[in-house]
Amino acid sequence: GRDRVFLVSLSFGSALAIDFAARHPEKVAGLVTLAGLVLIRDPRRFFAGVIRRVTKSIPGVANDIADPEGAEIAYERFPTSAGHQMLQFIKGARRSLPRVSCPLLVMHSHNDHTVHPDNALEIHDGVASSDKELIWVDDSYHVITLDVDRHRVYQSTYEFIKNRS
């Protein structure tokens, strides 16, 4: 028989996972989005097309972590051409949410400074799945896989997959 997979995604990776789950429902047993991104509220998004013509890169985003012991390895600069393409892809992923029918687990922090918490509600409420859960991990910021709540994130992800395998 065909193998089905669980997709576990972080940040922009969630847009990729949502797109895949919408396009290939027969291949996806479940979807986990961690600090998932389908909405960008930053007003600079309206100028992404112009910005990419003016400068090749902008400062990157890193270390949105509450844990003083935590650290994230990230790029110092972010290419503006990639940012424009990312915005276009995110719009498409958001439009594809109603075609996602697999079990869904959404985890996010109300204290995320990188991806607005409204994204969690947009994902949770936007999918067609009847089997869906939203967990807030508010002792952390954006990188919830490395932050204070990381063990809760790992355990919840494990249980979600185990209970649906």
Give the location of each predicted region:
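Active-site nucleophile elbow and catalytic-triad environment of alpha/beta-hydrolase enzymes
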Residues: 79-96
